[in-house]
Amino acid sequence: DEVPEGHYEQDNMKATVVPNRNKIFSSITQAVALSVATETGEQTDIALGIHAGDHAIYPDCRQEWRDADDHAFRMGNWDVENVGYFTPYLDGDKFDILKDGEVLCKDLNIDFDDVYVRTNTSYKPIFDEDTFEWYSDYKSASSVERVEAFLKLGRPDPAPYADETGPVTWEHVVTEVSKILAEHE
């Protein structure tokens, strides 16, 4: 199926739902955390990056889902008292995640751009067969939301972007995404 383009608020974005996506992620992290906690006897915490920006489209990004998931984990396993489960961005958005990332990079003396150039949230990543490089698109909802967060943060996204014509500049991305955002104000 074709990945829809535009803003998350549009009804067609429900086509981007991956069934049980966050349950898959949480099941893996819960299993690893429980194994570590059991082996070491130490508190072991997990965190999922689900955030409020996704509530409208993804049912597994809501507090009710998180609580039910944690309950199922605790009911379905022994010795879970040393496993913590956090969803720090449940009431936040991608901007909040970036803002915390910026602070943590500074605190850890890590270059923010070196970290975020290695990330890609695109639902339609573009592969350049000549250079063997991956690019983010700027048209899918996940990319629009990411660009919006970087704009709010006041810094350019270090990740490379492209469209059907090839690599594009950050300025081009900002121009195109600003048009999409203006339609949804």
Region locations from a protein language model:
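Nucleotide-activated chemistry modules centered on ATP-dependent adenylation/adenylyltransferase
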Residues: 1-185
